[in-house]
Structures are given as structure tokens and as C-alpha cells.
């Protein structure tokens, strides 16, 4: 049990360190944050000043019917980019939420960049 608590503390410390470095998302450049569960992948774009979610996307959405793998997460990035372009948002702050920048996280960020979003 002690190892689990130490790992949780390290994760919280890592998240805080990343958030301190990237700053807050504002209306001109909102923050996109990632969450991975064992089964699903979630991303949401947040304006931290207002405290409002501007756009979100996840593999749990029935109309998308995607799984949690790199190719589907890239499609998820393209869907989010389209939703952001509809709202005239072209610049984001990328918050990897303590996850390593590889695999699903890197694929998602790459898909956003390829779709024309400045991350």
C-alpha cells in the first residue's frame, strides 16, 4: 500500500510541475487536457479564466465508435480539430496531464498539428 501512495504522490507532483510550467488556458489560447482510462481516451479544451469547457471529444462517443488505439486516437484528434475550427480556435496549450509524451499522447498531438491546430 505504501508504494501505491508514493506513486500517487509522484503523479500529483508531476501534474503540478507540468501545470506550473504551461500556465493557464485563456480564450485566445485555451488548454487541451488529456485523460486516459483503461478503456477510453478523453480530451477537452478548457478556458481556465472562465472555467468552461469549450470542446471535448472521447472514444466513448457513440457516433464516433472508436477504440483506444493509436489510429483511432489520431482520428479523435482530427475530430477535435474540426470542432475547434468551427469555433475559430487555432492555437492551444497542450497539457499532457502527467502522461509521457509517446504512444497515444504523441499520436493525438500529431493529429492536431496535422489538422492545422498550433499546439
Curated annotation (Swiss-Prot):
Pfam families: Ribosomal_L18p
GO cellular component: cytosolic large ribosomal subunit
Superkingdom as given in the UniProt entry: Bacteria
GO biological process: translation
Keyword Chloroplast: no
GO molecular function: 5S rRNA binding; structural constituent of ribosome
Keyword Lipid metabolism attached: no
Keywords: Ribonucleoprotein, Ribosomal protein, RNA-binding, rRNA-binding
Oligomeric and partner information: Part of the 50S ribosomal subunit; part of the 5S rRNA/L5/L18/L25 subcomplex. Contacts the 5S and 23S rRNAs.
PANTHER family per record: 39S RIBOSOMAL PROTEIN L18, MITOCHONDRIAL, LARGE RIBOSOMAL SUBUNIT PROTEIN UL18M
Family listed: Belongs to the universal ribosomal protein uL18 family.
Annotated function: This is one of the proteins that bind and probably mediate the attachment of the 5S RNA into the large ribosomal subunit, where it forms part of the central protuberance.
UniProt protein name: Large ribosomal subunit protein uL18
Organism whose genome encodes this protein: Borrelia recurrentis (strain A1)
Record gene name: rplR
Amino acid at each position: 500500500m505504501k508504494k501505491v501512495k508514493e506513486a500517487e504522490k509522484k503523479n500529483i507532483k508531476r501534474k503540478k510541475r507540468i501545470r506550473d510550467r504551461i500556465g493557464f488556458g485563456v480564450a485566445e489560447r485555451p488548454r487541451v487536457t488529456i485523460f486516459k482510462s483503461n478503456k477510453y481516451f478523453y480530451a477537452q479544451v478548457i478556458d481556465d479564466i472562465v472555467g468552461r469547457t469549450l470542446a471535448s471529444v472521447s472514444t466513448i462517443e457513440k457516433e464516433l465508435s472508436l477504440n483506444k488505439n493509436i489510429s483511432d486516437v489520431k482520428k479523435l484528434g482530427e475530430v477535435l480539430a474540426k470542432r475547434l475550427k468551427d469555433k475559430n480556435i487555432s492555437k492551444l496549450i497542450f497539457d499532457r496531464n502527467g502522461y509521457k509524451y509517446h504512444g497515444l499522447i504523441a499520436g493525438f498531438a500529431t493529429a492536431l498539428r496535422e489538422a492545422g491546430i498550433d499546439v
